[in-house]
């Protein structure tokens, strides 16, 4: 069993609860990570507080299979996306990553969407493509802060359309 923080309804920190979940084995192309640190971002709070429900409604309109989804299909949900830890299992077909590698990553989902998973857990399974080796000089805590923040910074640089010499 793993320990995780999740929520079953929208609200403030009072809706968060610690639960036991069954440990998952990684499927093809996935790795399981023993989580050492998690990065919390403003988007994480906005999601569990329910601030992004209008975005979720639009997402449901776009995907007809989700039109009849009730609350039970959307909950429970995990908290946080960014993590750092050590790989403890590797699925078939994974190359470049091995058991014992220190890594960092971000649990990816549609923009503004929550996920039933969550990085605020003792272990998680993620696609190997969403995980990179942690640079040795960084602590696990520092590495766990890179995901969403670095994506935001990269997006800003793309918007600025910077070129060499700018």
Question: Regions from the language model: what does each represent?
Answer:
Residues 1-5:
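Short structural boundary motif marking the start of a folded domain
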Residues 6-9, 49, 87:
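Residue-level signal for short segments within beta-strands and strand-turn junctions
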Residues 8-12, 38-40:
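Short polar catalytic/cofactor-binding loops
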Residues 14-22, 81:
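Short glycine/threonine/proline-enriched tight-turn/helix- or strand-capping micro-motif at secondary-structure
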Residues 24-39, 52-107:
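Glycine-rich beta-strand-centered segment in the early N-terminal region that forms part
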Residues 43-48:
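Cytochrome P450 core scaffold surrounding the K-helix E-X-X-R motif
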Residues 67-81, 102-166:
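NAD(P)H dinucleotide-binding glycine-rich loop of Rossmann-like/cofactor-binding domains
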């Amino acid at each position: 069993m793993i320990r995780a923080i999740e929520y079953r309804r929208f609200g403030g920190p009072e809706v968060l609860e610690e639960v036991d979940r069954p440990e998952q084995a990684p499927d093809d192309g996935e790795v399981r990570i023993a989580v050492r640190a998690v990065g919390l971002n403003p988007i994480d709070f906005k999601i569990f507080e329910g601030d992004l429900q209008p975005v979720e409604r639009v997402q449901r309109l776009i995907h007809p299979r989700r039109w009849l989804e009730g609350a039970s299909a959307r909950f429970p949900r995990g908290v946080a996306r960014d993590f750092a830890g050590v790989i403890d299992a590797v699925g078939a077909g994974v190359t470049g990553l091995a058991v014992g590698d220190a890594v960092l990553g971000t649990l990816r989902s549609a923009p503004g969407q929550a996920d039933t998973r969550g990085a605020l857990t003792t272990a998680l399974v993620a696609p190997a493509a969403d995980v990179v080796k942690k640079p040795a000089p960084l602590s696990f805590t520092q590495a766990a802060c890179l995901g969403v923040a670095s994506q935001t910074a990269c997006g800003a640089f793309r918007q600025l359309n910077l070129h060499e010499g700018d």
